[in-house]
Amino acid sequence: MSAPVRRISARTGLDETSADGTFKRTDAAWRSTISREPGSTFPPEKDRYHLYVAHACPWAHRTLMARALKGLEDVISITVVMPIWQRTTPDNPNDEHTGWMFADHSSSGNNVVTNSAGLGGPFPSSYPSNEADPIFNARSVRNIYQKVGDKDGKYSVPILFDKKLQTIVSNESSEIIQMLNSQFDEYASCSEVDLEPEDLKEAMESVDSWIYPSLNNGVYRCGFATTQEAYDTAIDELTAAFDRAEDILSSQRYIAGDRFTLSDIRLFVTLLRFDEVYVVYFKTNTRSVANSPVLLNYCRDIYQMPGVAETVDMHQIKEHYFCSHPDLNKFSIIPRGPDFERMLQAPHNRGSFEVKRRRISQAAVSDEEKHSLKSDESVVSTL
């Protein structure tokens, strides 16, 4: 009897479910830091760093938003990968890995027309915003990792790449957005924007501690659960976190206080995809943003900030989710509604929190002035 053929499969999100049916996300492996400190291996420089991103991916979307809000478009270049996962080594029948691919606009290019199971579509073979890899001319994101010696990791985006040293700096989105916020001010066109102000750091850490596990990752814990018990635990936590965000945002403009921060980016990228994808695909239908006036207005407020709408491509978001996992959606049928991005273009009233805050501040100053006048009067009366 011949030995069984070992089928190679680099890891994807679908491979991160434990024996009890719980989705457990693998930690990012590349965690270096861009720093202005003397002797830093990765100092901030213009045109040195490159971001590999996907419009579909909420983790990558974080970096696109931070880059836009800080005005780093002319400082850090980007390449947007194709939305639908494909076989990364289609000529090797023993390697079943599927993942992010780069666009191939050549006439002979093997562009995306179906899902990795050969079903669904036909989908557009290319998009104007999706490009070939400008550094290695790689066909897949997997190839980028392999170029720097990562042969068996999880080949994810975003990737912050150092073109000078030809290596990956980081693939941890939460740390990349901190670097974009703090380390490139001398080059940023919006250097006055601080997305992690010192006086809000404690509040940010507090909200981030439940936004990530229960919402950002919570939707995946619901969608990739393989037992009812695992799903029930995840959906209970997600529902509670959704309500918690709604409660906080009913009394203040932003999730960590009176200013927009990185925590709002973290929350927004999940809420943006919630009704269009997660409610249906990941079975998070206990709540919806459209049915929450508070969260819908909050999303409108952020979407309408200069530069944010340009980071959103709902078409690619939906194509990725509904067409990249044949185990979840074999025929890659894409639901038509609910046109959430159109909802975000309507006016919002979140600015009323600023008016209220100014009135409270003015009232406080007025009270102090009254107290000061009374003190002066008492001094005069004693002379």
Model-derived features: where do they sit?
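C-terminal alpha-helical interaction module
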Residues: 1-383
